[in-house]
């Protein structure tokens, strides 16, 4: 980069922040050709936080979210040429895209310092080819210093939370330890105008421009053995005050947002705080429709009723299994009975209830798969996601399996199957069990009748439309997988037929 290019500007420099194309798999268990890919439906909140902080510090910031809009190489290259520095956000399922986009810039002859950051490289910091640095950890307290040092040629070894390539030697070096924001109330509310809000909607095109993500806490005090998220937050749990949260919600309401997704790992941990936020929403007359996630420990008729009054219509819970031994293996700290009670209480309060389930825990048998299936089908659940257990880098399960020599250093996401020595049941059986559970759950006439009646009672039809759309897309994906498999088998038989004729 030519330092003269920034001369005469009133800003401290121009920064481009990019979220590459990314999808998450619905009901896949990370097994190939299982489930379907779904696009991200929310703006990149992490980049918006950092972009806001950089903007307040005097930098000109542009954010491009290619997960929310169609990727255009020309737009990326043009924006990078306007910038003094380019940053990419790395999550588990866009790492290859990040590499491809960086290669795109290099091929176009764009010579700008490139940095990456995000949860994937926080868990396992690495330097990407053609990049100068990797930002590690929550960067609200460090990003301004890092960008300033890069643009002015400062000493990166003195920056916090950074892995960088020494310009003089080309060697990898680390800076000082990351800084974790202790007081979340001190972090400015993200400027959502940095992204085009019309790209995002959880409930289809009718609600575009009205959907926002809000984070009211970071981390989690629980220690589920399969979860790697606690490693991202250095095993801490921090919260924003109800007053701080309500101030953000008031600004969102004035701006016309009506659908909120509370992205906390567990919004319901602190009952007193949750009730204060709910009461504040009710008192201010906010007309939000809200999605939250929480553990079954918080199940309480009064709490659920108050949340419903505040506009919460969908509650997501991680039930994981209908087998107590599997819950203990996952270190959930709950019981099958408590899980069932939580679902019934939420249903009675008029909440739509979504639950996540995991198949393939170490000692699960055929009988256990059937027990989980019975448990799922007996509950008044409104939607489910099902996955096969994955040993993810950063989780306690991964560390234990790695210590036992069952997972190699480079295996960051290993599916629990008998082939990997991590479960009793083979991949093929777990794949069938996953598909069977989804089909039995979603394609019951009684399920759709109950969901329709619940929607009519609440006047909330968007959720049922979303589920219907996902079911159609799932069937389409499964039909496509089947046809591709048949085509491959057919092509494989063609040479043999020619040989037989010869």
For the regions a protein language model found, what residue spans apply to each?
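Structural recognition of alpha->loop->beta junctions
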Residues: 126-144, 304, 309-315, 371-386
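Radical SAM enzyme core and accessory elements
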Residues: 1-17, 55, 59-60, 396-402, ...
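Radical SAM [4Fe-4S] cluster-binding motif and immediate context
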Residues: 190-354, 361, 374
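Glycine-rich beta-alpha loop elements in corrinoid/cobalamin-binding modules
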Residues: 46-181, 388-394
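Glycine- and acidic-residue-enriched helix-capping/strand-helix junction motifs
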Residues: 29-45
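Structural motif
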Residues: 14, 84-85, 261
């Amino acid at each position: 980069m030519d330092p003269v290019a920034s001369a005469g500007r009133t800003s401290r420099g121009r920064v481009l922040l990019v979220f590459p194309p990314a999808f998450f798999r619905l009901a896949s268990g990370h097994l190939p050709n299982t489930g379907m890919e779904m696009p991200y439906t929310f703006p990149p909140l992490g980049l918006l936080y950092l972009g806001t902080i950089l903007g307040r510090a005097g930098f000109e910031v542009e954010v491009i979210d290619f997960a929310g809009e169609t990727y255009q190489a020309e737009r990326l290259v043009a924006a990078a040429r306007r910038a003094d520095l380019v940053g990419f956000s790395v999550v588990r399922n866009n790492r290859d895209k990040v590499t491809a986009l960086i290669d795109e810039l290099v091929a176009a002859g764009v010579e700008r310092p490139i940095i990456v950051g995000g949860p994937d490289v926080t868990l396992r910091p690495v330097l990407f080819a053609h990049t100068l640095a990797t930002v590690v950890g929550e960067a609200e307290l460090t990003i301004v210093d890092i960008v300033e040092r890069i643009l002015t040629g400062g000493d990166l070894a003195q920056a916090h939370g950074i892995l960088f390539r020494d310009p003089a030697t080309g060697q990898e070096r680390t800076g000082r330890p990351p800084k974790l924001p202790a007081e979340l109330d001190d972090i400015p509310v993200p400027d959502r105008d940095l992204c085009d809000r019309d790209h995002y909607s959880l409930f289809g095109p009718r609600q575009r421009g009205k959907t926002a993500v809000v984070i009211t806490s970071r981390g989690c005090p629980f220690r589920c053995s399969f979860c790697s998220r606690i490693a991202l937050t250095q095993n801490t749990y921090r919260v924003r005050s109800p007053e701080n949260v309500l101030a953000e919600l008031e600004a969102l309401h004035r701006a016309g947002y009506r659908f909120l997704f509370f992205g906390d790992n567990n919004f319901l941990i602190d009952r007193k705080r949750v009730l204060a936020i709910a009461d504040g929403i009710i008192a201010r007359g906010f007309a939000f429709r809200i999605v939250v996630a929480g553990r079954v420990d918080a199940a309480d008729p009064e709490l659920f009723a108050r949340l419903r009054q505040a506009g919460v219509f969908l509650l997501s819970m991680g039930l994981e299994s209908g087998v107590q031994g599997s819950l203990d293996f996952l270190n959930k700290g709950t019981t099958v009975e408590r899980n069932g009670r939580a679902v019934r209480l939420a249903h009675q309060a008029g909440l739509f209830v979504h639950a996540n389930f995991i198949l393939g825990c170490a000692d699960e048998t055929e009988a256990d798969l059937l027990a989980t299936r019975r448990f799922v089908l007996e509950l008044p659940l409104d939607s489910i996601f099902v996955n096969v257990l994955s040993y993810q880098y950063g989780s306690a399960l991964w560390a234990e399996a790695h210590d036992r020599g069952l997972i190699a250093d480079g295996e960051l996401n290993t599916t629990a199957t008998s082939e990997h020595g991590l479960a009793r049941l083979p991949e093929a059986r777990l794949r069938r069990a996953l598909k069977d559970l989804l089909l039995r759950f979603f394609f019951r006439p009684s399920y759709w009748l109950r969901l329709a009646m619940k929607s009519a009672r609440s006047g909330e039809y968007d959720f049922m439309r979303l589920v219907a759309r996902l079911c159609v897309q799932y069937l389409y994906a499964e039909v496509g997988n089947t046809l591709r498999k048949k085509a491959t088998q057919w092509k494989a038989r063609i040479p043999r037929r020619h040989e037989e004729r010869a």
